[in-house]
Amino acid sequence: MDLYTLLTSALCTLALPLLLLLTAAKLWEVYCLRRKDAACANPLPPGTMGLPFFGETLQMVLQRRRFLQVKRSQYGRIYKTHLFGSPTVRVTGAENVRQILMGEHKLVSVHWPASVRTILGAGCLSNLHDNEHKYTKKVIAQAFSREALANYVPQMEEEVRCSVNLWLQSGPCVLVYPAIKRMMFRIAMRLLLGCDPQRMDREQEETLLEAFEEMSRNLFSLPIDVPFSGLYRGLRARNLIHAQIEENIKEKLQREPDEHCKDALQLLIDYSRRNGEPINLQALKESATELLFGGHGTTASAATSLTSFLALHKDVLEKVRKELETQGLLSTKPEEKKELSIEVLQQLKYTSCVIKETLRLSPPVAGGFRVALKTFVLNGYQIPKGWNVIYSIADTHGEADLFPDTDKFNPDRFLTPLPRDSSRFGFIPFGGGVRCCIGKEFAKILLKVFVVELCRNCDWELLNGSPAMTTSPIICPVDNLPAKFKPFSSSI
């Protein structure tokens, strides 16, 4: 066989599969676009639909932030794609996001990807709708009342101080992100589920934390439950978590609750009993898992970002310490120490600005998911009924007209109150509308306690400098933020 014949054969062998792939991709796009609403004259947003069935999920999962940045630069604030098995429109920008968040029940409804719904379960607050969501949220909200938060502060302080002291004794390198996750996990177990973390040995704690990590990594995956798939691994981790939580729930059902301070899980149990309903163990496990996931994952992300920004901006750290000194909080001597309380924490105005600026630049949750209840028009484009809508928090913060020099860390920008008009949707770290994060005040108080304990006890430096960040699905440093801690001696 001569060289020409070999080359021709090789080209045909390569060209045929490529041609079939391109043809399949084109037919897939035609199929997806036929789902547009013919009764609406407005066009679909620009964008591409990827490969048959997979859409652009694989690219998004593998490339994460890079994928979103490229799409944003190519197509602008609104574009179409195909993610997690559904045609999807991704939305950025304060005014566009405002219409989505304020359109709950009218234009859109919460609708997480199938993998998230399967792993977290139908009984968790994020997946409930209408009256069921309303009543469950009202019950859980009691765990985040001002009275409840006031009772949490001493326990938060105890757990944070214990962790900070451990870092000071841990030698030349502490991996900050895993250490903070462990701390926030203990706090969430103690305050939200009423479980004493002291009863769990280190091995059990690590196993449960690893299970949460595995579940978190695989929350957003293709809805294919086969061995070694993302959904399969996520469900296996979820089942391990449920088994541990079930033991805690059964113990809780057998003992008398503290009438003065009830955790969120106890409130859900009491709600079922008051209504004469049988205890739904599966729903309680799903609610408890969601509370633990939201209660430690997002706060750990924010606290890690705070640690990073304060280390990189010594002028801001000095301002925080001056505020602590003004409030009598800088000294760690027992005879001079002022007791932390919710009233004292609310006086820390500049510290609040630092937390807000951290949440602006590094919001723990990148966005939220909705589904169109009917076809509607957004900024000139049609969003067909049944299509998923993802609104972006991080990108909206990054381009908000509300903030000059959006890429600069400047807490002073929050010393002036935000306007109450639609531009306020340029800052939405906790979402907005009726689906606004139920635990946002809990998170704010916890982050303030963390800043107080960190800044009055420690000096620290980042061993790798400014960290690269990734989203999986919560924003976190790629290198786990290695740092060196040493005791702080007040000289202000």
Curated annotation (Swiss-Prot):
Topology within the bilayer: Peripheral membrane protein
Catalytic reactions of this protein: all-trans-retinoate + reduced [NADPH--hemoprotein reductase] + O2 = all-trans-(4S)-hydroxyretinoate + oxidized [NADPH--hemoprotein reductase] + H2O + H(+)
Places the protein is found: Endoplasmic reticulum membrane; Microsome membrane
GO biological process, one term: central nervous system development
Record-level GO cellular component terms: endoplasmic reticulum membrane
Residue positions binding heme: 437
Main localization of the protein described in the UniProt heading: endoplasmic reticulum
First-tier enzyme category under EC: oxidoreductase
Claim: Endoplasmic reticulum is one of the keywords in the record: yes
EC numbers on record: 1.14.13.-
GO-annotated molecular function: all-trans retinoic acid 4-hydrolase activity; heme binding; iron ion binding; monooxygenase activity; retinoic acid 4-hydroxylase activity
Keywords: Endoplasmic reticulum, Heme, Iron, Lipid metabolism, Membrane, Metal-binding, Microsome, Monooxygenase, Oxidoreductase
Induction conditions: By retinoic acid.
Tissue: Expressed primarily in ovary, brain and eyes.
Classification via CDD domains: CYP26A1
Cofactor list: heme
Pfam families in the record: p450 (PF00067)
InterPro entries: Cyt_P450, Cyt_P450_CS, Cyt_P450_E_grp-IV, Cyt_P450_sf
Taxonomy, superkingdom: Eukaryota
Family statement drawn from the similarity comment of this UniProt entry: Belongs to the cytochrome P450 family.
Function noted in UniProt: A cytochrome P450 monooxygenase involved in the metabolism of all-trans retinoic acid (atRA), a signaling molecule that binds to retinoic acid receptors and regulates gene transcription. May regulate at-RA signaling during hindbrain development. Mechanistically, uses molecular oxygen inserting one oxygen atom into a substrate, and reducing the second into a water molecule, with two electrons provided by NADPH via cytochrome P450 reductase (CPR; NADPH-ferrihemoprotein reductase).
Protein name stated in the entry: Cytochrome P450 26A1
Source organism (scientific name): Xenopus laevis (African clawed frog)
Upper taxonomic lineage: Eukaryota, Metazoa, Chordata, Craniata, Vertebrata
Gene designation: cyp26a1
